[in-house]
Amino acid sequence: MDRLGPFSNDPSDKPPCRGCSSYLMEPYIKCAECGPPPFFLCLQCFTRGFEYKKHQSDHTYEIMTSDFPVLDPSWTAQEEMALLEAVMDCGFGNWQDVANQMCTKTKEECEKHYMKHFINNPLFASTLLNLKQAEEAKTADTAIPFHSTDDPPRPTFDSLLSRDMAGYMPARADFIEEFDNYAEWDLRDIDFVEDDSDILHALKMAVVDIYHSRLKERQRRKKIIRDHGLINLRKFQLMERRYPKEVQDLYETMRRFARIVGPVEHDKFIESHALEFELRREIKRLQEYRTAGITNFCSARTYDHLKKTREEERLKRTMLSEVLQYIQDSSACQQWLRRQADIDSGLSPSIPMASNSGRRSAPPLNLTGLPGTEKLNEKEKELCQMVRLVPGAYLEYKSALLNECNKQGGLRLAQARALIKIDVNKTRKIYDFLIREGYITKG
């Protein structure tokens, strides 16, 4: 007979009988061939030869009981559990009620056995001491330092960064200003009543379907932002800057296709092209060495050092190169001489030198989907597109200039530049636009 003690003397703590679903009372039967999970039977179902699915009445079995001694030869495991439960129910020291609940031991036997094996036993004392020491070792004596995280960023409410992030709330993983933020306005006046005509009912259902499609588009954009990690824009820009200029241009071009492919596939594509660029650059460098007749890296280091020295010497001849460049054009030569005179006198150059190559102007800013676009009129949208200024920033600058103009009774360009800490050319265009449209007056 195999004997195994239960965890508790309460029948509800034991598994139910698979035959009659009653709570098991010791002794009970466990099938040695079925399981997991274990297959338990009470004695009544076992004597009836209960069979269920794969379980057969001729399977080998184990008798589960707790009549074996643990701490004392005269105390069974079942009595040990009954003693502990009685002390927990009746309280320590109330040995008469403990003995009455146990029914098999006197109060003197209960007190003597409990004090000997559970209070004065050095084995239990050392075990409890070790557990206490281990618990104290886990608890730090000093305060746990708290470090704020910037991923995702947590800007202060109503700050410029918070508006640029459309009011992203990290604790809720949601935005204050949603994409298509006023989609719910189309539903505010819709009410389904029983006397609606079929056409009116179909029209209302079409409006609801359109609203559902707009919600799906909103969730799709949120998923793209979450999957590609676009919440932390600063971290995204730092990752982009670690690539060479050529790969950054590819990154900028392929960004619009990121919504089609997954984030992992998009990153693999960019990384593969970055690796290709590095390999091409290394091959070009090795080809340059071979063209110069260099066949080992020791000579290549000397070649690179001499090449760097020649480049520095060439840059020192910049003034002579400028003279040779503008000497054929009298007007350009006069401008260059005035510029050099200003530099020699310690003044900033008053006449900028024209570049032959010409700098390509930046394309107009696309305002589609940017927060605050719906608050602008057509002329303001054109201004934001030309100066490449997001609508939220423009509205903030406009409000600051209007408030200052109302306080002073007018506003000068110098005051506007002091209020708006951005590029002076953009400030001039905003100032001229507000003057031209009559929002502010000159001081």
Curated annotation (Swiss-Prot):
Region entry Disordered, spans:
348-372
GO (cellular component) term, any one: nucleoplasm
Where is the Glycyl lysine isopeptide (Lys-Gly) (interchain with G-Cter in SUMO2) crosslink found in the sequence? Answer: K132, K138
GO biological-process terms attached to the record: chromatin remodeling; regulation of cell cycle; regulation of cell division; regulation of DNA-templated transcription; regulation of embryonic development; regulation of transcription by RNA polymerase II
Q: Supply the alphabetized keyword list.
A: Chromosome, DNA-binding, Isopeptide bond, Metal-binding, Nucleus, Phosphoprotein, Transcription, Transcription regulation, Ubl conjugation, Zinc, Zinc-finger
Heme among keywords: no
Q: Which InterPro entries match?
A: ADA2-like_ZZ, Ada2/TADA2, Homeodomain-like_sf, Myb_dom, SANT/Myb, SANT_dom, SWIRM, TADA2A_B-like_dom
Q: In which tissues is it expressed?
A: Expressed in all tissues, but most abundantly in testis.
- The residues that hold Zn(2+) 1 are C17, C20, C42, C45
Q: Which PANTHER family match?
A: TRANSCRIPTIONAL ADAPTER 2-ALPHA, TRANSCRIPTIONAL ADAPTOR 2 ADA2 -RELATED
Q: What interactions and quaternary structure are annotated?
A: Interacts with GCN5 and NR3C1. Associated with the P/CAF protein in the PCAF complex. Component of the PCAF complex, at least composed of TADA2L/ADA2, TADA3L/ADA3, TAF5L/PAF65-beta, TAF6L/PAF65-alpha, TAF10/TAFII30, TAF12/TAFII20, TAF9/TAFII31 and TRRAP. Component of the ADA2A-containing complex (ATAC), composed of KAT14, KAT2A, TADA2L, TADA3L, ZZ3, MBIP, WDR5, YEATS2, CCDC101 and DR1. Interacts with CCDC134.
Name of the featured protein? Transcriptional adapter 2-alpha
| Gene (name only) | TADA2A
